[in-house]
A protein has these predicted regions:
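Flexible helix-coil junctions and inter-repeat linker/turn elements that act as hinges
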Residues: 49, 53, 81-92, 115-122, ...
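Short, flexible helical or helix-coil boundary motifs
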Residues: 44, 51, 116, 120, ...
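Non-transmembrane, amphipathic alpha-helical segments
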Residues: 25-32, 36, 56-70, 90-101, ...
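Alpha-helical interaction elements in eukaryotic regulators
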Residues: 29, 36, 67, 71-74, ...
């Protein structure tokens, strides 16, 4: 035998002559030459695993490279012979032995192809890839490295591995537009030597008419590898129904993980699979194969299974590998896009929308062929449905704010949970401003329309009063605040105490104002003009509260009705004055007792309100006390009527609006 005997040398057969294994072959400068059709057939038959146990136990491509070259040259020799027959006769009738031999060779090459793929395929390392990298830095593989891989494959095509069938290497066509995408991060899925071997086998199988078998083997093995990578990435096989039956809390976590995994799948896993299929199959052609009437003789299957592609072989193999996984990946996003709409889903749906929108250019690059159009269309349709879901959820949110049914008054007139929820919600909406400005294109309507039941009253609001440069999103946010106020006004009517109703509105509108001021993006959209209107509203509510509460207190400190005129004298009626002091004490004590339990959560507003009350109450009481104290103190038991100094009242005001019962009853603490 030429070359040293080793474990991968072919078994000897009865057809060999005594001169050795390759009596009809020779070597020239280290390149093995197969000199005749007969010697080529012998080489093929010696590796027939159906008749030789030794051939079954050994793989050609795992052994001596000279043996690999001999086998591939033998295949080329037989294929060239068949081609010559087909070209020399209008009705070719190739030798049966030759066609049987090529069938044996193709079966062997199919096994070799599968074995190389299996031994070289490993799932991606999820831990290293599930790390977000900036788009500008995400293409970790340089174009030089890729060019070297292409050159290696092309060089192999020019050697005895690939040159025999005359197919062009097509290396230059590998440099597709995806190499220019800064977000694509391709990795080497299989080593360069294995890629070269796979390409040399694929070239011969395709030339012999075994395209379908080659594609099926490739797709089967690589799809298993992709499936394993999916498992490593935590991508579950869930149907759309399975996903829609999950609780939203569980889905939120899955959405968060899906976004990370989808970036890896599109930009690395699928892109790398596309590159691998190009390295192996791009530029291969069946043009050098025998003519169509002879092709069925070379197929292990029936003629009806002949494979035809409108796209390139590399694209066919790529889609055979990833189309199923890609559909599985997108099914998750599709299930979310068509799930039941509710306000709490908006932000995760927007996260999903933004992630898919960001991936769409990469999807268009990775799945650029006509054959992959369905995947591009599916992704675009899901994106459209997510956008529609976001619009629908915002509409549902507006409706929910208007309809919120709670009628139980909030204790102490503090901030209603609905107010906190709505303002936190629209503050989060402002974080997605850029996306929602693109998605929300129709203006809100303050008139009754199809969104609202005819039985439900809707606030009137003239949007034309606002500045014209408002985005439609800004108008919707203002509309949400309008209907929130409208609902709060209705809720305030459930307070029996009118002053508490005003106090409630003051607290809630003030919270709305402060939330807008504290969220720059929200403030920019709402605008200072509308913010001033809201500020005016809570101040009016504060004024109305003070009037409803403190006017009746201050009325006790007026002079009217205290002066009397008689036939013998004129002056102050002590009995009326005593009643006036008693009324003041009683009313103020009741206000103090009740309103100490009322709550103003905002420290600054609470202090401003106390100061405003003190500025009205204390001067009036001090003046009243100065004018009439002597009349009370000249009588009996003056302490029953003048119970408090103005300092006592000043201290008592500080007990108000803490949300707790007064720590002690009012009592005289000082003597003015």
């Amino acid at each position: 035998m030429d070359g040293a005997e080793n474990s991968s040398s072919p078994p000897h057969t009865a057809s060999e002559d005594g001169c050795g294994t390759f009596s009809s072959s020779g070597e020239l400068g280290g390149v093995v030459l197969v000199e005749s059709l007969g010697s080529a057939e012998k080489i093929i038959l010696r590796w027939d695993s159906t008749v030789s146990e030794e051939a079954r136990d050994k793989m050609i491509f795992s052994g001596d490279r000279l043996e690999v070259d001999r086998y591939l040259q033998a295949v080329d020799h037989i294929q060239n012979s068949l081609r010559s027959v087909s070209l020399s006769s209008p009705t070719p009738n190739p030798d049966t032995t030759t066609t049987t031999t090529i069938q044996i060779a193709m079966a062997r090459l199919e096994d070799e192809f599968r074995t190389i793929l299996l031994s070289s395929s490993t799932p991606v390392d999820a831990e290293s890839l599930l790390v977000d990298t900036p788009r500008s830095n995400s293409n970790s593989r340089s174009s030089d490295h890729f060019s070297a891989a292409v050159a290696a494959a092309a060089e192999a095509d020019g050697s005895s591995r690939g040159g025999g069938s005359g197919s062009g290497g097509g290396g230059g066509s590998f440099m597709r537009s995806m190499r220019l995408s800064t977000s694509i991060r391709e990795i080497d899925l299989i080593g360069e030597d294995a890629v070269a071997d796979l390409r040399s086998i694929a070239e011969r199988m395709i030339a012999a008419g075994y395209l379908r078998e080659c594609v099926q083997v490739y797709g089967s093995v690589r799809k298993s590898s992709v499936d394993a990578s999916f498992r490593n990435l935590g991508i579950e096989k869930l149907s759309i129904g399975d996903i829609q039956r999950l609780e939203w809390d569980a889905l939120e976590n899955k959405i968060r993980h899906w976004i990370k995994a989808a970036k890896v799948c599109i930009r690395t896993l699928f892109a790398s699979e596309k590159r691998l299929s190009e390295l192996i199959f791009e530029g291969l052609s069946s043009s050098s194969a025998v003519t169509p009437p002879l092709q069925p003789l070379f197929s292990l299957s029936s003629p009806s299974r002949s494979y035809s592609f409108s796209s390139s072989y590399s694209e066919a193999c790529f889609l055979e590998t990833v189309k199923g996984p890609a559909i599985q990946l997108f099914n998750f996003a599709e299930a979310i896009s068509i799930s039941r709409r509710s306000p709490e889903k908006l932000f995760k749906i927007l996260d999903l929308h933004d992630a898919l929108a960001d991936l769409l250019p990469d999807i268009d690059v990775v799945f650029e062929s006509k054959a992959a159009e369905s995947i591009r269309v599916q992704a675009a349709e899901i994106l459209s449905r997510l956008a529609e879901a976001a619009r629908g959820i915002l509409s549902e949110f507006e409706n929910a704010v208007l309809r919120e049914p709670s009628k139980v008054p909030v204790p102490g007139g503090t901030i209603h949970p609905l107010t906190r929820y709505v303002m936190n919600y629209i503050s989060l909406i402002s974080d997605y401003k850029q996306t929602l400005i693109e998605l929300i294109v129709s203006k809100p309507s303050s008139s009754s329309n199809s969104r609202y039941s005819g039985e439900l009253s809707v606030p009137d609001f003239d949007f034309t009063e606002l500045q014209e440069d408002r985005t439609t999103l800004a108008l919707h946010l203002i509309w949400v605040i309008v209907i929130l106020e409208f609902n709060l006004e209705a809720k305030s009517q459930h307070y029996r105490d009118t002053s508490l109703a005003h106090f409630f509105m003051m607290n809630n509108v003030h919270y709305i104002v402060q939330k807008i001021k504290g969220t720059p993006e929200l403030r920019e959209m709402i605008g200072d003009e509308y913010l001033r209107k809201l500020t005016g509203k809570y101040r009016i509510a504060a004024t109305n509260y003070q009037r409803a509460t403190w006017v009746r207190v201050l009325n006790c400190l007026r002079d009217e009705g205290l002066h009397v005129k008689g036939s013998f004298s004129s002056g102050v009626s002590k009995s009326l004055l005593r009643e006036r002091f008693k009324s003041f004490n009683s009313i103020f004590e009741e206000v103090h007792r009740v309103q100490a339990t009322w709550l103003v959560p905002d420290t600054q507003l609470r202090e401003e309100l106390r100061i405003s009350i003190a500025e009205k109450l204390l001067p009036a009481y001090r003046s009243f006390l100065g004018r009439f104290r002597s009349h009370i103190e000249s009588g009996r038991h003056p302490e029953q009527y003048i119970k408090y100094s103005w300092e006592d009242l000043d201290t008592a005001v500080l007990d108000l609006f803490e949300g707790n019962p007064a720590t002690q009853h009012l009592r005289r603490r000082s003597q003015g």
